[in-house]
Amino acid sequence: MPEKFLIYNGSSIHYRMIGAGKTVVFIHGFGEDGSVWNQQVTFLKNKFQLIIPDLPGSGKSELIPGITMESMSDVIKEILTQENLSSCTMIGHSMGGYITMAFAENYSGFLNAFGLFHSSSYPDSEEKKATRRKGIEFIKQHGAFEFLKAITPNLFSPVSTGKMKKEIDTFIESLSYFTPQTLIAYYEAMMRRPDRSMILDKSSVPILFIIGQYDTVIPINDLLKAC
């Protein structure tokens, strides 16, 4: 797949661009990189022009200083600008959905539609912030990979965990490159993100919600309330 790079504030940002047609941007989540979308790429590449970035600090992209949901949405906007694109549909998974919401707030004119894939427009609750702080302490003590090995199986339903153990183990092994600095920066950025539920209320473009019945990370009632 065509691999491209963007220099953003002195850091190299990697993304893939494939296909032709209307542009769809897929933004991965925490503890992932753009390869998580490979099956979607295979299915959609003959129908759309797909842009799949590695977020700063993930995959082949370098971490940028002072990372926030807003600065990562700025990176996505710069990719679109570099490719002379003025519109797209954007789908964000988990943390990628938080970035999509920041993009919708600051660059709404670029969006034909957007979607939240197991994600939310709401900020972290105090309980969630406490959980993230515990995660940060675990990362500091045991390292990034041990943390990802501990939490990643929780992203899959009990049925999937049983049926796809080999695939899940392979996916987890692919995450060994992550650094503590990157994961801690992501957690701190997610803890600081604001409530963007009003963006959904005010949006004039179609919005897609993909909700998991067995999602243990994003409360399903919060997602249903936002729909």
Q: PLM features: residue spans?
A:
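Active-site loop/oxyanion-hole signature of alpha/beta-hydrolase fold enzymes
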Residues: 8-11, 16, 39-42, 51-91, ...
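Active-site glycine-rich loops that stabilize anionic/oxyanionic intermediates
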Residues: 21, 29-32, 94
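The conserved beta1-alpha1 loop
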Residues: 27-29, 211
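Serine-hydrolase catalytic-loop signature spanning alpha/beta hydrolases and amidase-signature enzymes
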Residues: 29-39, 50
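Alpha/beta-hydrolase active-site loop signature
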Residues: 31, 55-59, 121
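Conserved hydrolase catalytic core segment
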Residues: 43, 85-125
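Conserved alpha/beta-hydrolase catalytic His-Asp/Glu region
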Residues: 124-130, 142-202
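Conserved loop-alpha-helix segment in the C-terminal half of the alpha/beta-hydrolase fold
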Residues: 202-227
